[in-house]
Amino acid sequence: MKLDRNVTSLATAKSRNDHAAFTVTLALKPGCEEEFLDLLTPVLDAMRHETTFINAVLHQDPQDPTRFMIYETWADLEDVVEVQMHREYRKAYWDRLPSLLREPRQIQTWTPVRQDFTFLAGW
């Protein structure tokens, strides 16, 4: 699956040390939620071991269980575009995703300005 043109062009304009955050919004065909999660879970599990990975949070719309949003932060935008998106562990997800979507996914790229976290037991 191809990256959004804005993500690719932004990567060429940034230095290798700039952090980047992405939001990816996906609207699935009804009944595809379980398959989507089965394909995405190993990708998220593998991503956490990448050296430029900072964090990822998967969200599900409480009003529409077929809508998901992934928030990712990476230490190096160019690495995401040139290396991470082409990792073998993403292949099954990329290959199957188009048939699960009811509309094109929406990708936005952000530059983190501030990060505040509290880590709660049980989350």
Model regions: which residues?
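Short acidic/polar alpha-helix capping motifs at helix-coil junctions
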Residues: 6-10, 18-22, 33, 57-60
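Short, solvent-exposed alpha-helical surface patches in well-structured domains
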Residues: 35-38, 82
